[in-house]
Amino acid sequence: CIVETVTPELGVEYAKNLGISTLTSTDLNPATALGGITDGVSNLELTSAFAAIANGGVYTEPIFFTQILDHDGKVLLDNQPETHRALKDSTAFLLTDAMAESVQTVSSFARPGATINSTSTRARLSNMSVAGKSGTTTSNNDIWFVGFTPYYTAGIWGGCDNNQSLSSNGGTSFHKDIWRKIMERVHEGLSDPGFAVPDSIETAQICRKSGKLAVEGVCDHDPRGNAVYTEYFAKGTVPTEVCDKHVVVTVCAASGMKPTEYCPEKRSKVCMSIPQDAEGSTDDSAFGIPGYCNIHTDLSTIFTQ
């Protein structure tokens, strides 16, 4: 569990720095990483925490008015919110990029032609970049969606006063529909600038099978298609190792298997490196290094083709 590496103490410190005020000493445990906190969290504080991510890591105290004027226009109260940096701008952007995927439909690399709906596609806006995260409590007693665009952040909570479980038959998705319909109205007439990439971020070409630097001409020739994608990194954290999952082997041009001494023509083929002691199978298993050619097994097979 990553929270054990980070430590619950540091995780709680970050949450408090993002404006979560309900945390107690009993929340210094790994369950807090999943939202299992003793006194829960208000929609206002959770939405404000997400707004800090949307704001490049700068937290702004939520306020409900900026000024109160008298009948002559004199300022009686000037309400300026407290702000402070809660996250590095690179961290905020990487979180934004990750949460943007939760509202997208993505192609399945393992099964070409198939698509995968992420958890919050119902919150996707027609002409605006969106990032966000949905969540539920035990037995669907509470449902959440908090998301943001380059302009605004909004949070929707759904539940019952008596804490009863919501129906799984559509009862756990309506909050995303509410969020989408409100935000569609709010963003009418606004152009989509996308999420700004800070100078503290750099990109690299990564192999999706190894998570390491892609090898040109190899990782992009995976039997299932191009396994290379562009990933964002905080500067100085780009991987230095290159992919070790894709290998180029010489095979018989006819059988596609490792050549024997009798194979008349050979070609190169990209395969997956499967550990010799691997048990079971994965999506990569069908694309491992093949056995020896079963067509050209002796000298006579050369002259019968």
Residue ranges: model-predicted function:
Residues 40-245:
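A penicillin-recognizing enzyme superfamily signal
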Residues 12-26, 124-125, 153-159:
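Active-site-adjacent bridging/hinge elements
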Residues 1-20, 27-55, 98-101:
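Active-site-adjacent helix/loop patches that line small-molecule binding or acyl-intermediate pockets
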Residues 17, 25-28, 91-96, 137-138, ...:
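Short flexible/disordered coil segments
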Residues 5, 59, 63, 191, ...:
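Amphipathic repeat-derived elements
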Residues 18, 78-85, 173, 177, ...:
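A short, terminal or domain-edge coil/loop segment
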